[in-house]
Amino acid sequence: SGTGVDNVLTVTLAGVFPGADSLNTALTLSGLTLTPPLTVNYLVAAGGGGGGGQVGGGGGAGGLRTSYGSITGGGGGSETQLTLVAGTNYALTVGGGGAAGVVGPSATSGTVGTNSVFSTITSSGGGYGGSLPSPTAGAGGSGGGGGATTNVNGPGGAAVTSPVIQGKSGGNGFYSWAGGGGGGATTAGANGVTGAIGGIGGSGLSVNILNSGNATTSSVGEISGSDVYYAGGGGGCGSNTSAASGGIGGAGNGGYTSGGP
């Protein structure tokens, strides 16, 4: 979306999407009188991972890649703008979020988010949150938070680094029934801690490729003041009476129970 300013067209691929991917969507540039090349800024955010089901870790944020501003997801430098040609179709894939894990005797971890693609730019889906009985979290654009058991601190998932870093790792679960927070675009998820307190999710990245008014209209990102944040990590589950918060950038909060599983 957006308009050309000084021969720069801004394209945003992020927001709230259905669970199923939007595949084979075409971006067509036509009816334009241009002097090649047309350079575009972009923000591509993948689907976030699903949180773990039973004393689970938070889902990791989907990977975030952008050419706008000074940094991209994971703290790397902003990426190179793309060059597009009028009259050419460019395929888009909008990745869906991963499913949350199942609670109960047959508890499961969440599932990974799916990738988002714009032209040659691919952002990796977020890692899943760990859960009883397998508390290890999954890797992704940002890693999922580790789950918890009575004997094991479930390790958080790693953030992918290839082809570029896109987010941060998930926090570790704590054996006293506290899941780790999912990683966000700028900070890692927090570890679960004693007292059965789940870890908070990692923070997303402020990218004002759209101003706050346009982002609100388009239902993308999370607004804070005049800034728009993307790709926060989910909060981890605890066994106390307060839910761990998700990181700024549209993430969900962790759940809680009144005691251990």
Model regions and ranges:
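Low-complexity, glycine/proline-biased repetitive segments and flexible coils/loops
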Residues: 3, 11, 16-24, 39-261
